[in-house]
Amino acid sequence: MKKRCSGILMPVSSLPGGYGIGSMGQAARDFVDFLVLAGQSVWQILPVGPTSYGDSPYQSCSAFAGNPYFIDLDQLAADGLLKPEDYAKENWGTNPNYCDYALLYQKRYKVLRKAYAAFLQQRPVPGYDTPYSDDWY
């Protein structure tokens, strides 16, 4: 006999977020905790690949990459790659019930480039800067 389960379909983009769209950050962890408390065992999400023209999650340019819109900016700040003032002062839109993808694209990539530049300035972590294929030679 199969075990039954229940859950919800909700895209990551629908999570609450102060930066134009929901992310895989604290709001996602809080939502999973809520699902557990509600006795749910499944959270079905829409595809999370990067989108292109039209911003449809079903029209991704990659089967493997993740959508940079879902990167948690607060976590990047906690990791020392951003300062809160790098993104908190940006205009992420005026309606919390609507995602302005054109504005999001313009603002999010600007902030993510700052985080990437900070990442490049960090010292390498021992063991992570070694090619994975060394053992295969």
Name each model-derived stretch:
Residues 2-137:
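Acidic/aromatic-lined carbohydrate-recognition and catalytic surfaces
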